[in-house]
Amino acid sequence: MAHPIRKTHPLLKIINGSFVDLPTPSNISYLWNFGSLLGICLITQIATGLFLAMHYTADTSSAFSSVVHICRDVNYGWLVRNIHANGASFFFICIYLHIGRGLYYGSYMYKETWNIGVILLFLVMATAFVGYVLPWGQMSFWGATVITNLLSAVPYMGDSLVQWIWGGFSVDKATLTRFFAFHFLFPFLIVGASILHLLFLHETGSNNPTGISSNTDKLPFHPYFSYKDTLGFLIMLMMLTLLSMLSPNLLGDPDNFTPANPLVTPPHIQPEWYFLFAYAILRSIPNKLGGVLALLASIMILMLIPMIHTSKQRSLTFRPMTQFLFWLMVSNTLILTWIGGQPVEQPFIEIGQAASILYFLLFIIFMPLSGWWENKLMKW
């Protein structure tokens, strides 16, 4: 009997093993869609970004006007630009939901997959940061100045490091040019890391909502989950199109409609909404180096989670106490996001500091303690 070509062709059999005949747990919910949605986000961002790069000029004197030119004179340039800008927001919505699902259902126990995922998060954040500088508006310029300046907190070599990143003594033409180069390069690194992420995931197979082995009950990925994913694609792309058409500037900063001016500081310097939680943690520590370390720790803490998992159960499905702590962590992160967008004054300073302390306590102490306590209760 002849085998289908998809099972014998050297290239097609890799695709077949990943997207067609892949054994998938029968009970995974729509929360497992976000990985494929992130793939679609990445493809959309690379495609729209490529067309934007064809018309963009990475020069301080013409960057802002080149973006205006794209929106006014290029055929459907306004749409490509709006989809690219709002696509970044959808990328982060999907990535945070994807991480949240991983935390809730214990997917972090696949350590290699999880750690590559955290590296991917860093890469996506770096890409979004350098991309935000490119339109060369007020918030682009001052955001770049403030965030790159944080490197001056590095002992001994901080100032040299900042000037090396800037390519001079301030954020200027050299900075913009290299940020454009980085913004073009990083998505391809993300594609490479995503392939590794999938490679390691397919070594173990997917987790499922119960957190127990599903080897006795698997389905082929196609047609069941390929159609399930397609519904997710349609919903997300429809929402992205609606936002880009009807309210394209909803998630942006009005300050970025003003060309960059090194002589005028905006009243509130803040990053895009998806970085506000980390920005709030950074601001809650009065010491510069301490703030930078806390900022890094707020993301790096994800790598620690597999090591401090104490429960005998993998998922939170049957762990009500840790479930409460998980939702407390989600609420706390939303509070930090709100605080990050507020001015540095009373009572926001205290709220930010309390939320920052709780953020780290939940991950490092409360959740492991709760897992240990639930183990004890199981013996009764």
Swiss-Prot record:
GO molecular function: metal ion binding; ubiquinol-cytochrome-c reductase activity
Any single Pfam family the record assigns to this protein: Cytochrom_B_C
Gene3D superfamilies: Cytochrome Bc1 Complex, Chain C
Record membrane topology: Multi-pass membrane protein
Location of this chain's protein in the cell: Mitochondrion inner membrane
Record text on cofactor binding: Binds 2 heme b groups non-covalently.
Required cofactor(s): heme b
GO BP terms in the entry: mitochondrial electron transport, ubiquinol to cytochrome c
GO cellular component, one term: respiratory chain complex III
This protein's name: Cytochrome b
Gene responsible for this protein: mt-cyb
